[in-house]
Amino acid sequence: MWHSLPPPARGVQASVIIPAKDEATNLPATLAALAAQTDLHGQALLPHSFEVLVLANNCLDQTARVVREFATRHPRLRLHVAEIKLPKAQAHVGQARRLLMDEACRRLEQGGHPRAFIASTDADTRVSPTWLISIAAELATGVDAVGGRILMDNADPTCPVRRCQLRDAAYYLLRARLEDHLDPTPYDPWPRHHQHFGANLALTARAYRHVGGLPVVPYLEDEALVQSLVRHDLRVRHSPTVKVFTSGRQQGRVAVGLSWQLRQWAELQQTQREPLVDNPQRLLAEWQLRAQLRQTWQQYSSAATSGALLPLPSWPAAAGLSRAALRRELTRASSFGQLWEKIRGRFLVHTTRRWPAVPLSVAIRMLREQVAALDSRPSAVVAGQLCT
């Protein structure tokens, strides 16, 4: 599939990957945004510093032809396209993005840049002019992956679905602020956001190899990849400076994604119903528990190294655990991310009935009250306190 591509430029730092199925109409704008990449001073990026890989999978239109014609008109852009007909069982974005990321990683390793990274976007998305340089700046701080902001392209502010989307964004940004208060991480400080999706996601080639590549699932493959990174204790930054603009189409190419979410909001608007979302009281308890568990993990790891016997904390019952079960999980886990994934599953079973989902407007009000209260208190008092 990729055998006809020229070798990567020596020292290429970024490989941009774009899965495309019947995207002949949208791709020119997507590619134009990549061809116009600049540094923070407005100077064009060096042509050899990045390349773009497009995989036209199971297309019925002229997607591949459009890419080739664009490449001819923009010879400075290192743009490559491959075509593939995937079997029905594999004809989904997860498989397409995996094939792209695997090839991007291979080429970056061949190029030899020590900080090489894979940058994922979509065929209906326009990246900001400083997208790549902003990703590189975040990765230079030592993080392993970057999730950027995904904004609606030319959205009508009077559209009912648009209003629902803005309220949803407000909810998740308030969540991110609450999480930062309760369990702050030095590599993902505030200001940050909540998104880490395929339209705007980057990770180092080294991190990609470390987790064994992109999980092959029909949809939400981006979420599965981030979960794998977290499970391996790799550092994911949610950067507000890394931005893209995506289409607001309701007929998308995947079973579950932004277009599916927009359709769900439209249906709720038509029936005058509100979305139900996670209860902020449960979120508060969850993140305080995680902060406590993180502290216990660090102490346990140090004690295991020194051979000391560490007394266990008194809070495991809040997660539906006995002390014996907690000690067992601490012994089995090879990373904090793996430990938290197991404990969180038990916590959700233990607390779902206690804190059921609530309407979006109620959740926003609760979060605003929680965040306002925490904003007025010293951070040392907030972090790590367990809510029961």
Locate predicted features:
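Conserved nucleotide-sugar donor-binding
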Residues: 195-212
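Conserved donor NDP-sugar-binding/catalytic core segment of glycosyltransferases
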Residues: 130-167
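Short, flexible, basic/aromatic active-site loop/helix in glycosyltransferases
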Residues: 166-193
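Terminal low-complexity segments of carbohydrate-biosynthetic enzymes
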Residues: 266-388
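N-proximal low-complexity "stem/linker" segments adjacent to membrane-targeting elements
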Residues: 1-49
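Acidic donor-binding/catalytic loop of UDP-sugar-dependent glycosyltransferases
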Residues: 62, 113-138
